[in-house]
């Protein structure tokens, strides 16, 4: 259910883009993200930090896109979110000395410290590369290609990287946790 809720604003954005244009899609994205946030609060009495940060960035960059009637702002949102995620992962590892991935999953999984560090660093690099790919595609290729990349490309890349992370984690689980 949570994954569906997280994906819903993206589907709404894509549908409105195909039916109308980038500005209608941006307005729909803002509304859909707000609805998902409100629903999460009403239904679960909890809103995750990442969802709240994403909402704020959607409102700021989406609002700027609509106010200035300039799609470059909404295109930057993707890279800014990925940069923030990568930054949080790197700061947690190098400054706070405990990888964010470990803080998030450490209660459910027992992994050696080097595995947590490598996994955390791998996700940081993944987010950096996705942010850079977004810059290239958003500003060097046609808008419709960027929309398809944002909706399908980044989603597929994230799913694949999540599966690869799962394989990496499984390989390093203690034998009794693998069953």
From Swiss-Prot:
Key word Cell inner membrane present: yes
InterPro entries the UniProt entry points to: YciB
Gene Ontology CC entries for this record: plasma membrane
Compartment(s) where it occurs, according to its Swiss-Prot or TrEMBL record: Cell inner membrane
Source organism, top-level taxon: Bacteria
Keywords: Cell inner membrane, Cell membrane, Membrane, Transmembrane, Transmembrane helix
Membrane topology according to the record: Multi-pass membrane protein
Segments passing through the bilayer: 22-42, 50-70, 76-96, 121-141, 149-169
Protein family: Belongs to the YciB family.
HAMAP family reported for this sequence: YciB (MF_00189)
Function: Plays a role in cell envelope biogenesis, maintenance of cell envelope integrity and membrane homeostasis.
Name under which the protein is recorded: Inner membrane-spanning protein YciB
Organism: Escherichia fergusonii (strain ATCC 35469 / DSM 13698 / CCUG 18766 / IAM 14443 / JCM 21226 / LMG 7866 / NBRC 102419 / NCTC 12128 / CDC 0568-73)
């Amino acid at each position: 259910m949570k994954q569906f809720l997280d994906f819903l604003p993206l589907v709404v954005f894509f549908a409105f883009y195909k039916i109308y244009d980038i500005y209608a899609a941006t307005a729909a994205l803002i509304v859909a993200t707000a609805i998902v946030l409100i629903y999460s609060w009403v239904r679960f009495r909890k809103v995750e930090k990442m969802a709240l940060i994403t909402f704020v960035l959607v409102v700021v960059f989406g609002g700027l896109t609509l106010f200035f009637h300039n799609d470059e702002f909404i295109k930057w949102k993707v890279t800014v979110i990925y940069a923030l995620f990568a930054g949080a992962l790197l700061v947690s590892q190098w400054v706070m000395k405990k990888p964010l991935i470990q803080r998030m999953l450490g209660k459910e999984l027992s992994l050696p410290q080097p595995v947590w560090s490598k996994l955390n660093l791998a996700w940081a690099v993944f987010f950096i590369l996705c942010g850079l790919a977004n810059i290239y595609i958003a500003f060097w290729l046609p808008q419709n290609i960027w929309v398809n990349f944002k909706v399908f490309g980044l989603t597929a890349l994230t799913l694949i990287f999540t599966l690869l992370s799962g394989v990496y984690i499984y390989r390093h689980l203690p034998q009794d946790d693998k069953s």
